[in-house]
Amino acid sequence: MERSRNLFERAQKLIPGGVNSPVRACLSVDSAPVFVERGQGSKLYSVDGREYIDFVESWGPLLLGHAHPAVNKAIHEAVDKGSSFGAPCEDEIRLAEAVVDAVPSIEMVRMVSSGTEATMSALRLARGYTGRNKLIKFEGCYHGHGDAFLASAGSGVATLSIPGTPGVPDTVVADTLLAPYNNLERVKALFENHGADIAAVIVEPTAGNMGLVRPAAGFLQGLRELCDRYGALLIFDEVITGFRLSYGGAQQYFGITPDLTTLGKIIGGGMPVGAYGGRREIMERIAPCGDVYQAGTLAGNPVAMAAGIATLAELKKADYPALEKRVDALASEIEAILKAKGVPVTVNRLASMFTIFFTEEPVTDYDSAKKADGTLYTRFYQQMRDQGIYLAPSGFECAMVSLAHTEDDFAAMLAAVRNVTF
């Protein structure tokens, strides 16, 4: 990894931490980052000439794998016509039609340029629509780096053990109410004390940024009922789960319909994109037809729209249950191998995602996720990477499996797990 290390040293002189998103620095796994030259299918190729089987997928967008021919073709054709217009184009409508057709809760949708923009905009809309200010979020859930969401957040905030962040005034997070994930009783108590002031509950319907944590039976339905009772909006942050758990996302998978949904990652096919949508009466409060302002220079970017259209067209044909069955078998075998080594381990999995927690206890919320042994994960990560298996450089993230992963890829993954020593 000599060239990767040299590039990292060069980057650190110019870019804070040498990276443009904190987890990529690999600090929590005591490693230098791999600098990537290209991706193809299920593989990444580093500047050092190494091939890796990729189980990160750019943190989730690449359910089709790297450089999918249909997506690449759409991108090339779009960029040949121009990279950005700052004016409406037909592909904005075509992608909106695909999203509305797929996602149960969405009657209208607004395109933005990132998942963070989507969640920030959805919260502003919820506050504008309800005339209330308070928000309930869950410990360990990550909704981007908007100020209101950086209280007890997951993802890089959890990876780097940052309790919050300087630069966010106390007055901003004062309206953010926290509850443990899967703890409906705590949510009930918050509504009993603040119900008239709560604009929304935002939740990852399957948590993916404290590692993968499934919703307990009745949890999402309970949130739906509480929001209905108190007149608050239920926001599903489906930036990770949208088009991954099923074509209609987590809300289709679990059969629970939120008021607003945020999307990102997969809907751009690897291009920078986000979206938020919901019931027509709520979405019509957004400017210019309503009084809740939101805008973006690159929102509806034609290249990103083309990539999204091509991606969703391919995913509409995908066999999601078959992929889930394959991933469940893979995760079960990984868990069995590690347990046979005498290692404390719990492997949470759902659809095409899984997380290896080095703890014997069930992981059902942020507190139990934090009990996992980070030192064991570091050893595991380093040895897996040395064997050509590219995992997230954090125990608080998910392994992502794509439709491009083959049985040979799975066999190589399992062989590498067998070779790990602790």
UniProtKB/Swiss-Prot annotation:
The main enzyme category here is isomerase
Give the UniProt entry's GO cellular component terms: cytoplasm
Check the record and name the Pfam families matching this protein.
Aminotran_3
Source organism's superkingdom? Bacteria
Which coenzyme or cofactor does it need? Answer: pyridoxal 5'-phosphate
Pathway, per record: Porphyrin-containing compound metabolism; protoporphyrin-IX biosynthesis; 5-aminolevulinate from L-glutamyl-tRNA(Glu): step 2/2
Q: Which residues carry this modification: N6-(pyridoxal phosphate)lysine?
A: 265
Q: What is its main location?
A: cytoplasm
Q: Could you state a single Gene Ontology molecular function term? A: pyridoxal phosphate binding
The subcellular location is: Cytoplasm
Gene3D superfamilies, alphabetized: Aspartate Aminotransferase, domain 1 (3.90.1150.10), Type I PLP-dependent aspartate aminotransferase-like (Major domain) (3.40.640.10)
Q: Which GO terms describe its biological process?
A: protoporphyrinogen IX biosynthetic process
Indicate whether Cytoplasm appears among the record's keywords. yes
The reactions it catalyses are: (S)-4-amino-5-oxopentanoate = 5-aminolevulinate
Assigned keywords, A-Z: Cytoplasm, Isomerase, Porphyrin biosynthesis, Pyridoxal phosphate
EC number(s) given by UniProt: 5.4.3.8
Q: Which family does it belong to?
A: Belongs to the class-III pyridoxal-phosphate-dependent aminotransferase family. HemL subfamily.
Assembly with partners or alone = Homodimer.
What is the protein name given in its UniProt record? Glutamate-1-semialdehyde 2,1-aminomutase
Query: What is the species listed in this Swiss-Prot or TrEMBL entry?
Result: Oleidesulfovibrio alaskensis (strain ATCC BAA-1058 / DSM 17464 / G20) (Desulfovibrio alaskensis)
